C-alpha cells in the first residue's frame, strides 16, 4: 500500500470549504465533493467536486455540481456507479422542489462530464426533505433521506438505474416490520451501503 503526502483538495480557498465526501471509481481514480461558501458569489454554499488519479494528481479542475444557486446547496455525498461514473447528491433549499428543502442529484461519466441535468430525488415535496445519502451497486444506485411527513421525520428510499431512471417509487423505510405506517417520533440522519447485487443496509 502506497501512502502519499496530504494535499489540499479545493482550489478555491476563500471563505469556508467543508463537509467532504469521497468515492473510489472503477478505474482506480477517485472523486471528492464538498460544500464551498460564496464560491458562486451568491453568499450561500454550493457543491463542488474534483477528480483525482489513483496517486492523487488532480484530473482537470474543480467544478460546481449544482445548477441552481439561489439558497444553499449543502451536505454533499458521492457514490461510484458501476458504469465507471459517479453520482452526487446534496440538500437544496433554493425552492427547486416547490417547498422549503429537497434533495437534488447529478450523474457524471468516468471523465467527470455531467450526464443530463440536476434531478429531484424525492417524489414527496411538501415541507422538508434533507439529510441525503447514496450508494452504488451493479446497474444502479440507491438514495435515502429524511422527510417531514405527519408531523415528524421518517426515512425514505429511492432506487435508480445507471441512466438516472427511477426503479419503483420512493419507499418508507423507518417502520416496524410488517407495519404499513411509519414509526412514532423522528427518524433522521440515515446512511446507506450497498452490495454489488443491490442488497442494501440502511441505518
PLM region spans:
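Extracellular, repeat-based ectodomains that mediate carbohydrate processing or recognition
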Residues: 1-203
Amino acid at each position: 500500500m502506497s501512502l502519499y503526502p496530504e494535499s489540499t483538495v479545493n482550489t478555491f480557498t476563500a471563505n469556508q470549504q467543508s463537509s467532504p465526501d469521497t468515492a473510489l471509481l472503477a478505474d482506480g481514480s477517485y472523486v471528492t465533493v464538498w460544500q464551498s461558501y460564496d464560491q458562486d458569489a451568491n453568499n450561500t454554499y454550493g457543491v463542488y467536486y474534483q477528480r483525482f488519479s489513483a496517486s492523487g494528481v488532480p484530473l482537470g479542475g474543480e467544478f460546481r455540481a449544482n445548477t441552481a444557486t439561489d439558497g444553499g446547496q449543502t451536505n454533499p455525498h458521492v457514490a461510484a456507479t458501476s458504469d465507471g461514473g459517479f453520482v452526487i447528491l446534496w440538500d437544496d433549499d433554493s425552492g427547486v422542489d416547490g417547498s422549503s428543502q429537497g434533495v437534488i442529484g447529478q450523474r457524471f461519466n468516468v471523465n467527470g462530464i455531467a450526464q443530463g441535468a440536476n434531478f429531484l430525488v424525492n417524489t414527496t415535496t411538501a415541507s422538508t426533505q434533507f439529510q441525503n445519502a447514496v450508494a452504488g451497486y451493479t446497474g444502479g444506485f440507491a438514495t435515502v433521506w429524511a422527510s417531514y411527513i405527519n408531523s415528524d421525520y421518517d426515512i425514505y428510499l429511492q432506487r435508480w438505474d445507471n441512466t438516472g431512471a427511477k426503479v419503483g417509487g420512493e419507499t418508507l423505510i423507518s417502520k416496524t416490520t410488517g407495519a404499513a405506517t411509519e414509526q412514532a417520533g423522528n427518524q433522521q440522519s440515515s446512511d446507506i451501503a450497498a452490495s454489488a447485487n443491490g442488497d442494501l443496509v440502511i441505518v
